[in-house]
């Protein structure tokens, strides 16, 4: 139920937006009379007005939107309605436009994309999967090209990496890019691993529109995009520790808070571990690897559920997105947790790889100069949008009144009773010819009900978020007479269900939802599958005390729940009190789930701050190195002086043998100078002597180069090698640190403080190590030339 104040604030926002809509309508009347050539010419004119400073994007908006609107009609046969203009204005302002299913978000986005692309900077439409990005791009590309702009799909389905690099540069030179959040995130990470200026391809992240914005920057905000590197030293403890954990008893050996994904050993558990593994002190420095593996095994055993968080498929652990129900093939849990789950399932443990580069979606989109989003369920996440991203949500009115009937929840004692009643209702609906869409929380449940319906001679389509393109087609057909579709919550999302001939008279699409989801936004999205653009329809959610939401999140008194559960069926059927009580339990459990989700995202955001700041600083330094074009004229003495001062200050006693050893290890393999004249008690004298050796080695290296051009390449490569090797170690260390600190202190505020303190210390160590490796690399790296005359650098 909407609060009166919410409605008033939204109406005030709409009031100011409608003034702009009125100006767009005035311009729309004007441009209708333009010839095609005159309308196309406006794009050139707009660019010139922006370049000259006569106009800004804001002042151009009414006229530019009118031009894009008229072009849409001439090219696509679609004329954006006023509700779409409202959404388009909200998107340009960098906020969240709530637009209901079927209101034309794809067409709405074309206007702010066109306007912002006029600036010549990077403009992006980001959606959740390749199919939707490709579908929307192919539908809208003719419009942009007709208007004189270039548009491209942000990815190529070609395995050849060298081809992809060249193609990427071509893709990102276009005015408008249609891509996915995952593709863009990985491109950002790959771009910042480039070893030359020519290897970079990603332009400025200027303006972006995120489709299904709540799914991407709220539900998936914590999801890290990870590029893996070399294998870590593999632990052989996974299976052994799993056997130990199997002997432990909850509340005796360990304590667990499933709602917070927290688990830890109690004193008896610590004693049991010390006895089992024959260690004197489990928390000694020598036993930290063992403690880490025990914590991983506990989490894998009790906090990750098969067929809920993951399932075993073709000998692999395939993760499941709890919010969306979608499978995540190729995605792995970090810091050894994936391997612990493999051990739990009795599988061969895969190699745990180090992390080369990582970023969360939350921080990826904060890199944009401006971004906005579209969703049908923005209002329910408004406070979080504002707290995390400073975005307000504006609810655009629907073009036609919503006719869908959202029926009250149907309440049952047990899941078996619920399932019987639900199947009975589905059979009755199917007999009338109404199309039915049954939505389940898990793929396992969807497969079960699909089989049951087949056994009852009700043919059905099963959609469990495996084949996006195929499922989009199937979900689009779910509105035909007699259609029966069984799906998980995310299957076919982004595709409208249009009613077939005669279905409207039958009452439209009936959406049956097997249980409340962990988030009320998802419930609302599922109801919204029916009743698009004023169509009739209905939705109903079936609930019981056995539901996952209740078992996982309910904080109700267990005895009270058992008392409700034990009531006989006759009393239940006559008990409104029972219905109200169960609804209260479910609603409260869902609220707890949502609150924990918000807290988890806030916690993840806090942890991410250190690595985000460090990543920005490191990538800035990489870019400075890539911009070096006059290495021959650069003076690297200041860098070397810093490094040599570190060396002399770190040594307690400077001796001749130690200084000579340092020179061999860091400056020159051929050093043979007599050092008798050096006063090793004078640190500054040692620094001066080392600087002399550094300059001699640098001059020798320069002499070995064929040209200043190759010397420039040499300096860039050896410096990048120093930065990357140290940064890779730091990223991997921070991933391990986060897992360790969070586990040790159960996610409390002191865990965050501890993490940031250690992260800062390690960053300072890393910056010193980068300088040291730069000096070592520039002195001791060698350059040779292959048969084609191309330089090959050999690092020390």
UniProtKB/Swiss-Prot annotation:
Gene Ontology biological process terms in this record: intracellular protein transmembrane transport; protein import; protein targeting; protein transport by the Sec complex
Main location per the UniProt record: membrane
Membrane topology term: Peripheral membrane protein
Keywords attached to this entry: ATP-binding, Cell membrane, Cytoplasm, Membrane, Nucleotide-binding, Protein transport, Translocase, Translocation, Transport
Top-level taxon of the source organism: Bacteria
Catalytic activity: ATP + H2O + cellular proteinSide 1 = ADP + phosphate + cellular proteinSide 2
GO molecular function, one term: ATP binding
Pfam families for this protein: P-loop_SecA, SecA_DEAD, SecA_PP_bind, SecA_SW
Residues reported in the UniProt entry to bind ATP: 84, 102-106, 496
TM ranges: none
Enzyme class: translocase
EC number(s) recorded for this UniProt protein: 7.4.2.8
Alphabetical list of InterPro entries matching this protein: Helicase_ATP-bd (IPR014001), Helicase_C-like (IPR001650), P-loop_NTPase (IPR027417), SecA (IPR000185), SecA2 (IPR022490), SecA_DEAD (IPR011115), SecA_motor_DEAD (IPR014018), SecA_preprotein_X-link_dom (IPR011130)
Localization per Swiss-Prot or TrEMBL: Cell membrane; Cytoplasm
Annotated Gene Ontology cellular component terms: cell envelope Sec protein transport complex; cytosol; plasma membrane
Quaternary context: Monomer and homodimer. Part of the essential Sec protein translocation apparatus which comprises SecA, SecYEG and auxiliary proteins SecDF. Other proteins may also be involved.
Family: Belongs to the SecA family.
HAMAP family noted in UniProt: SecA
Function: Part of the Sec protein translocase complex. Interacts with the SecYEG preprotein conducting channel. Has a central role in coupling the hydrolysis of ATP to the transfer of proteins into and across the cell membrane, serving as an ATP-driven molecular motor driving the stepwise translocation of polypeptide chains across the membrane.
Protein name: Protein translocase subunit SecA 2
UniProt organism field: Staphylococcus aureus (strain Mu3 / ATCC 700698)
Gene that this sequence comes from: secA2
């Amino acid at each position: 139920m909407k609060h009166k104040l919410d409605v008033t604030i939204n109406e005030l926002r709409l009031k100011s937006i409608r003034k702009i809509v009125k100006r767009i309508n005035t311009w729309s009347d004007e441009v209708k009379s333009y010839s095609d050539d005159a309308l196309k010419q406006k794009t050139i004119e707009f660019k010139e007005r922006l370049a000259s400073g006569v106009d800004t994007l804001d002042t151009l908006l009414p006229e530019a939107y009118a031009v894009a609107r008229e072009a849409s009609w001439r090219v696509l046969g679609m004329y954006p309605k006023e509700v779409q203009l409202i959404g388009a204005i909200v998107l340009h302002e960098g906020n969240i436009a709530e637009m209901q299913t079927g209101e034309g978000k794809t067409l709405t986005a074309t206007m702010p994309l066109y306007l912002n692309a006029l600036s010549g900077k990077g403009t992006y439409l980001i959606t959740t999967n390749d199919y939707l990005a490709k579908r929307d791009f192919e539908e809208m590309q003719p419009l942009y090209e007709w208007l004189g702009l270039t548009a491209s799909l942000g990815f190529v389905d070609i395995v050849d990496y060298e081809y992809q690099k060249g193609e990427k540069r071509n893709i990102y030179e276009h005015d408008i890019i249609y891509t996915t959040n995952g593709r863009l995130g990985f491109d950002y990470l790959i771009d910042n691993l480039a070893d030359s200026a020519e290897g970079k391809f990603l332009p400025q992240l200027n303006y972006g529109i995120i489709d299904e914005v709540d799914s991407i920057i709220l539900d998936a905000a914590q999801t890290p995009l990870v590029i893996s590197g070399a294998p870590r030293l593999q632990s052989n403890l996974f299976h052994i520790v799993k056997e130990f954990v199997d002997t432990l008893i909850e509340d005796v050996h360990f304590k667990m808070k499933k709602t917070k994904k927290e688990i830890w050993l109690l004193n008896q558990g610590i004693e049991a571990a010390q006895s089992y593994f024959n260690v004197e002190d489990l928390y000694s420095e020598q036993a930290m690897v063992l403690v880490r593996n025990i914590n991983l095994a506990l989490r894998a055993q009790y906090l990750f559920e098969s067929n809920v968080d993951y399932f075993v498929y073709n000998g692999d652990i395939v993760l499941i997105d709890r919010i969306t129900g979608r499978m995540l093939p190729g995605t792995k849990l970090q810091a050894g947790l994936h391997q612990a789950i493999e051990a739990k399932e009795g599988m061969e443990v895969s190699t745990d790889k180090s992390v080369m580069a990582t970023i969360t979606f939350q921080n990826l989109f904060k890199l944009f100069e401006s971004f906005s989003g579209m969703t049908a369920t923005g209002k329910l996440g408004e406070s979080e949008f504002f707290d995390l991203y400073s975005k307000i949500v504006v609810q655009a009115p629907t073009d036609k009144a919503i006719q869908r009937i959202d029926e009250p929840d149907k309440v049952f004692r047990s899941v078996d009773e619920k399932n019987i009643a639900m199947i009975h209702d589905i059979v009755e609906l199917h007999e009338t010819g109404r199309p039915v869409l049954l939505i389940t929380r898990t793929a396992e449940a969807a497969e079960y009900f699909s089989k049951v319906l087949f056994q009852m001679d009700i043919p059905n389509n099963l959609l469990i978020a495996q084949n996006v393109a195929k499922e989009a087609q199937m979900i689009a057909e779910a509105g035909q007479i007699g259609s029966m579709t069984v799906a998980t919550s995310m299957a076919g999302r982004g595709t409208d269900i249009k009613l077939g001939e005669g279905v409207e008279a039958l009452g439209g699409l009936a959406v049956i939802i097997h249980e409340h989801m962990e988030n009320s936004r998802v419930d609302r999205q599922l109801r919204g599958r029916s009743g698009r653009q004023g169509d009739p329809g209905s939705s109903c959610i079936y609930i019981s005390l056995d539901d996952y939401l209740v078992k996982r999140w309910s904080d109700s008194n267990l005895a009270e729940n058992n008392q409700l559960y034990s009531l006989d069926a006759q009393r239940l059927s006559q008990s409104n009190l029972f219905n109200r009580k169960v609804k209260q339990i479910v609603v409260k459990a869902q609220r707890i789930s949502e609150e924990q989700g918000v807290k988890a995202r806030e916690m993840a955001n806090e942890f991410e701050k250190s690595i985000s700041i460090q990543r920005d600083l490191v990538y800035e330094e990489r870019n400075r190195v890539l911009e070096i074009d006059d290495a021959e004229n650069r003076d690297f003495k200041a860098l070397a002086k810093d490094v040599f001062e570190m060396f002399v200050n770190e040594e307690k006693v400077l001796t001749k043998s130690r200084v000579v050893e340092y020179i061999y290890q860091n400056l020159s393999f051929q050093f043979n100078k007599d050092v008798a004249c050096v006063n090793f008690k004078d640190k500054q004298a040692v620094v001066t002597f080392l600087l002399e050796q550094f300059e001699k080695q640098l001059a020798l290296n320069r002499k070995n180069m064929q040209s200043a051009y190759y010397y420039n390449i040499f300096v860039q490569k050896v410096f990048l090698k120093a930065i990357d090797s140290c940064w890779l170690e730091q990223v991997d260390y921070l991933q391990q640190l986060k897992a360790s600190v969070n586990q040790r202190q159960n996610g409390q505020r002191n865990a965050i403080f501890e993490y940031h303190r250690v992260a800062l210390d390690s960053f300072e160590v890393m910056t010193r190590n980068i300088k040291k490796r730069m000096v070592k690399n520039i002195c001791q790296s060698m350059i040779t030339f292959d048969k084609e005359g191309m330089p090959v650098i050999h690092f020390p």
